[in-house]
């Protein structure tokens, strides 16, 4: 199976397991800059040179050898499950993508027809989001009406493939304390170019795709919604130390235990 979703600097200074909706655009640009002294001109997801990616055939053997021998510092980044799925809804369901089209073509018409979701004009964001949550749960639990999408499938699922196939993380940090976490990675590796995290832009490539969130995070999650979120993301809350009880508290409640993550996700 290899290491899907894994990126590595050309210098092999660091390896990163991408988790969608968890600052991956910014992280990719930091990696690129640390090698080249300049940011990639465009969305780093579109880069086909200057950085190794599992999706690029020529990179696969290099990544596989590096990861299985643990030759480089390896990390990933996680995010509060409440804000992550909200972000997925506004970006992927309500938004227009980089190519000027709706995400995955017929997905939004399917949601409008089967789940009664609205995405146009001055729609009821809370009601539509809660219906989207039912859809997300259906895809994850029953794989219908489609397979789960990488942007709302559990973070633990993405992170576990790296472990199960022979990799080990040296660091997993929280998006909510991004500068501190990313700096801890940069401090641990040999890099060709220093990166000033405080001065660099944030490469939030999904920003502006969809409407702005009109309410506080907690307003989107009633008791049923919280139940659905916990059903989907139970392992994410527990392993990455987020507060399930209070959707309004986006900050983690504690430090991530790497040994626990490897033990539970390596099974």
Walk through the language-model features, giving the residues of each.
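Membrane-interface amphipathic segments in extracytoplasmic regions
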Residues: 1-267
